[in-house]
Amino acid sequence: MRVLISAVGDTDPFRNFHDGALIHIARKYRPEKVILIFSEHTAKKQGNIEKALFSIAPDYKPEVKTHDSIISDNEVHIFDVMFQRFSDILQEYYTKEDEFILNLSSATPQIKSALFVINRLNGINVKAVQVSSPEHASNENIGHDNDENIDELIEVNEDNKVNFIDRTIEDNAEKFNQALLKKTARDFIEKFDYKATLDILDQLSDFPNLKSVREEIRDVVNCLSKQDVPQGLQHKKLKEKEQKILSAYLTIELQRERGNVSESFIRIKNLTEFILKDYIENRYLGLIKNYRKDKNKDYLSIFDYSKLLKTKREFELLRTIDPIIKMNSSRNMVAHSINPLDKDAVKQLGIAMKTLKTLVREQYHFSQSDFNFYQDLNKKLLTKLN
């Protein structure tokens, strides 16, 4: 069965000697069933709407059903309310066996917009139809025929003929769909979720800058998965080792921004150990080698490096890394158990991140611009996606 679901607006059933949207869609598609949704303001039209529907052709007698709930005039201009109301209505009547038509051109702008969005987001098999005005322009200044005699309006209706001019437009809303995908991609970029962004961009039709945005984000995604250095960082005037350290630190920042606290805990200690190893090797040649030999260790932990720093009276550096050492018990809990993190552990992470940034900045003299790499990348990507 073909079913038309339609709100009733001021231009229904007729306006300026022509069909309103509701009647025109029924004239074109001849639905066997018409479900009408009235507001308090339009409820008085029920008899005229039914009469107009039956005037389309002598042999056309659709089943007309009025939705039980009448929409308050106080709500018809509130988009959120209309979105929820019409979502519920569509779900109430929808069946997979029937072919549904949705009128996108009757009622208030908020109702029309709600129906338009519902059609795009619900993912159900509904044919959404718009109707252009007879003039194919705005009909804002054309009066309504609400107070005229319905029989006379039917008699003078210029669309009431076999070879009427079809003004229906089946809506596939491709531009809207693309705009929605683009907005979703922007939202993911702002959350530093580049993998999700790339998945969305791969669904977009081509537009200026899309290729370059995809390439930049794909590079970031690949580098994050392999712990490699993004091309944008490679272009900075930094030594290879500095690029790796900065990239490792920024990856930890990204994980924290995205709420991946557990991953941040694990990575902070690893990067700190690398920095301390680099610091000691550059200043105390052979110290680490001899310590490994004495202790018969291949891998040195943050505690080993701390002991070595104490032997060299590096008390300022020891004070700097103290919050990271204190954090280690929480880090071990994350790495070796499935227990959730408590509030104190999350607080420790914030302190440890500040400590790590201080350590990285002091040892390698990175600028604030270096630390803002992903924020600056996001600004560039968002500008290209405008």
What are the roles of these predicted feature ranges?
Residues L102:
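Conformationally flexible catalytic loops at phosphate/diphosphate-handling active centers
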Residues S106-T108:
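Terminal helix-to-tail segments of small alpha-helical proteins
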Residues M1-E99, Q110-N386:
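Long, low-complexity, Lys/Arg-enriched
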